Regions:
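Active-site-adjacent loop/tail segments of enzyme domains
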Residues: 136-162
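Active-site HxH/HxHxD metal-binding segment of metal-dependent hydrolases
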Residues: 23, 30-105, 124, 194
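Accessory terminal helices/loops
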Residues: 153-163, 172-219
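Divalent metal-coordination and catalytic microenvironments
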Residues: 17, 27, 52, 64, ...
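Active-site metal-binding loops of divalent metal-dependent hydrolases
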Residues: 28-30, 53, 77-78, 109-110, ...
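Conserved beta-strand hairpin/beta-sheet module of binuclear metal-dependent hydrolase folds
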Residues: 1-43, 116-129
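Core dinuclear metal-dependent hydrolase active-site scaffold
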Residues: 15-18, 92-121, 125, 157
Length: 219
């Protein structure tokens, strides 16, 4: 599986998973970059993963479903239009006709937030939506600090080598906060240098890794 990103809005990422001419995407807040990428590559869109209900993660979902007739996995409850396969906490499902993912509840940013984990790739991967960021965590729109702590504890249980793909490019601002909290943390300083180099050539700072988050994330 190959993972790429599509830019959306000012700082959103729509993640793509590509294998043998097929593609799955995560959080299509805007349908336009999805259409353009599929037209360019000729891939067949088979699956969509939705992490939570916010418009910048779901805004293009109905248009994408109507255009490609693909499956859409997301939080249960019927509140996200376009989700064809609602998921419960710790429910497994398959995408791209092969890869098994586990959806698990990760509340805090929203109450319905799901994260998606797969260990069938070269390194384990996690799509964390807006709960876990590189060097940070999501703003509490609906959940409580206790909810966020619950979610952080769940992430701690994942393999340290897990690659973390979150929903936004917030890394530099997160690292600035982390530096203020731990000004002598050399791992934070090194991460900032690497991130600034990547952003200077318009490359994503992501993915992060779970073991990196243990070293630099103040949350």
């Amino acid at each position: 599986m190959k993972i790429n990103h599509l830019d959306a809005f000012s700082d959103n990422y729509i993640w793509t998973m590509e294998s043998e001419g097929k593609i799955a995407i995560v959080d299509p807040g805007d349908a336009k970059p999805v259409h353009e990428y599929i037209k360019k590559t000729g891939y067949v869109l088979t699956d969509v993963l939705i992490t939570h209900h916010h418009w910048d993660h779901t805004g293009g979902l109905e248009e994408v479903i109507a255009e490609y007739g693909c499956s859409a996995y997301g939080p249960s409850g019927g509140h996200i239009k376009g989700v064809t396969n609602p998921l419960q906490d710790n429910e497994n499902f398959h995408i791209l006709d092969y890869y098994e993912f586990r959806a698990f509840s990760a509340p805090g940013h929203t109450n319905d937030q799901l994260s998606y984990f797969c260990d069938m790739t070269e390194k384990p991967i996690l799509f964390s939506g807006d709960t876990l960021f590189y060097a940070g965590c999501g703003r509490l729109f609906e959940g409580t600090p206790g909810d966020m702590l619950f979610s952080m504890d769940r992430y701690k249980e994942l393999p340290p080598s897990t690659l973390v793909y979150c929903g936004h490019e917030y890394t530099e601002s997160n690292l600035k906060f982390a530096m203020a909290v731990e000004p002598h943390n050399q791992d934070i300083l090194q991460s900032m240098k690497q991130v600034q180099e990547a952003r200077s050539i318009n490359k994503p700072s992501l993915p992060s890794k779970i073991d990196t988050e243990f070293k630099i994330n103040p949350f």
